[in-house]
Amino acid sequence: MIIFMKDFEEQVMNLVNLLGISKDLFFILWTVLSILTLLLGVTMGVLVIVWLERKISAGMQQRMGPEYTGPLGILQTLMDGIKLLLKEDIVPAKGNTWLFNLGPAIVVIPVFLSYLVIPFGQKMILSDLGIGVFFWIAVSSIVPLGLLMTGYGSNNKYSFLGGLRAAAQSISYEIPLALCVLSISLLSNSLSTVDIVEAQSKYGILGWNLWRQPVGFIVFIVSSLAECERLPFDLPEAEEELVAGYQTEYSSIKFGFFFIGSYLNLLVSSLFVTVLYLGGWDLSLPFLPGLNHITMTWYSSDGITEVPSIFLSFFITLIKAFLFLFVSIAARWTLPRVRMDQLLDLGWKFLLPIALGNLLLTASFQLLLLG
């Protein structure tokens, strides 16, 4: 259930009691409503990200980009998605139908589950788990299995090579990513995403982990781009080499699943960069004191109650996340694609030792500080 303010939850429960609705039924309805709201929200986020990528890419190439479908072409992505869903769903005749059909779901579902532990704003989170960040790492590790299933089930050499590349790339960069997350957890003394943000907000903008973990921040950014298969790390679907990689044999809604999953994963990485390193919803700027503590009035049956500016914190989180999105989009059109051996060397020979050394230094610092 989405956590808003306690007063709001208490008043909703009072209304439920007045209407005679059982608490169990209300909990089920509220959970379903929360999940549907999340799905709708992240889907709208994907549409906005695709539109932004088209516009930014067009600007970097001195083109117009989407222009006519809706204001500033913002509905062009929606129209393209509808057209894609109306196409024929083709299944390879000699492929493994079970693996071919199940693979896209295995790839997309873990990405959706990652949103459960992301605090979109102050007290705006579906599930504040005590192991939130490692829940994200755990569900993300399921994705390579789905990629291998799609590559093998397609009965296509390009798809199979793309699946192998994707699995190798994901495994190679997930370890440095996890080590960076562990370093942040040591500094915050918690694995909860909410606790990590609150630990940074104690000291304002100077308390952000960006300043305390600059090396980890760089490793996390590079590993996140590799996990999202963004240029220069898009080897699993390199068009010049593998047609479309593990997506080669897919069409219609199944191909759309990969498309949605890719941008959802990019948004997840952007939000975790914000939560782990950029203070989440916190925006305590030295030249704007008290901005993070602006309150708004909320009218209820009990009178006027002051609550934290939840929606302001939501927009602050999104603005920070979209800064990372801009970096990833700009990198797509400025950096060349690396070779497979270079990608693996970067992950295993450089990022992994650096992330491990950063973790050891962080642990040593914490021991000296606490000792």
Swiss-Prot record:
Provide the species name. Answer: Psilotum nudum (Whisk fern)
User: What is known about its subunit structure?
Assistant: NDH is composed of at least 16 different subunits, 5 of which are encoded in the nucleus.
Which protein family is it in?
Belongs to the complex I subunit 1 family.
Q: Name one GO molecular function term.
A: oxidoreductase activity, acting on NAD(P)H, quinone or similar compound as acceptor
Q: What does this protein do?
A: NDH shuttles electrons from NAD(P)H:plastoquinone, via FMN and iron-sulfur (Fe-S) centers, to quinones in the photosynthetic chain and possibly in a chloroplast respiratory chain. The immediate electron acceptor for the enzyme in this species is believed to be plastoquinone. Couples the redox reaction to proton translocation, and thus conserves the redox energy in a proton gradient.
The transmembrane segments are: 32-52, 98-118, 129-149, 167-187, 255-275, 310-330, 350-370
Q: What is the name of the protein in this document?
A: NAD(P)H-quinone oxidoreductase subunit 1, chloroplastic
InterPro entries (UniProt xref) = NADH_UbQ_OxRdtase_su1/FPO, NADH_UbQ_OxRdtase_su1_CS
The EC number of this protein is 7.1.1.-
Q: Which reactions appear under catalytic activity for this entry?
A: a plastoquinone + NADH + (n+1) H(+)(in) = a plastoquinol + NAD(+) + n H(+)(out); a plastoquinone + NADPH + (n+1) H(+)(in) = a plastoquinol + NADP(+) + n H(+)(out)
Q: Where in the cell is it found?
A: Plastid, Chloroplast thylakoid membrane
Q: What does the record say about its membrane topology?
A: Multi-pass membrane protein
